[in-house]
Amino acid sequence: MYPVDLHMHTVASTHAYSTLHDYIVEARQKGIKLFAITDHGPDMADAPHYWHFMNMHVWPRLVDGVGILRGIEANIKNRQGDIDCTGPMLDKIDVIIAGFHEPVFAPQDKAANTEAMIAAMAQGDVHIISHPGNPRYPIDIAAVAAAAARYEVALELNNSSFTHSRKGSEDNCRAIAAAVRDAGGWLALGSDSHIAFSLGGFEHCERIIAEVEFPQERILNVSPRRLLDFLERRGKPAIAELADL
């Protein structure tokens, strides 16, 4: 079991069904020590308003021993790698995931998708690329993994890509994990929960990790401290309330 989950959605994204409080309760029951709420960026039709992200400072950092990170799953908008998390939002958010979503950036050919994904990493604000194995968005896996290692951006293994979403992702996810391993980069695991019961569900990710013999030393979810250290290296301030997790 990994004690950190880095990708989930609340009722603020209206196609999801749980609240922040629901996730805290579930985390306590499952032994999850730290999680990031990553509702969709505002360019998605059912995403929270900009004010949602600007007001996340009202969230407690720690509830009943469970740490809470303020996140976003931003949208990669174009081949230049622009995302819908900019300006003052950047200072309000602890962890920025970014990925392709069809309502914002329609699937392109492999060259264009690769260009956009690498450009998003190069801009310097993105910490994790979400579900890069989506077969609707073919990429040059080796080039993306090399760029991710160079920019210290984690590529995600998304558990829901094996179950409810993005059918046909498994072979790509396996190839991505192997490419990240060979490039010396980071993997991040995300349940991509849209309901609290899925929190911390990484069983399919764990199978891929075992199959490619991915080193645990390069998985961000191994401990809260590893994830927090990663964010601090990437320029985020230390979060005093989470120092003892």
From Swiss-Prot:
EC number: 3.1.3.-
GO biological process, one term: bacterial-type flagellum-dependent swarming motility
Binding site residues for Zn(2+) 3: E73, H101, H131
Keyword Transcription regulation set for record: no
Positions with a binding annotation for Zn(2+) 2: H15, H40, H194
Pfam families with a match to the protein in the record: PHP (PF02811)
HAMAP family listed in its UniProt record: YcdX_phosphat
Descriptive protein name: Probable phosphatase Spro_1934
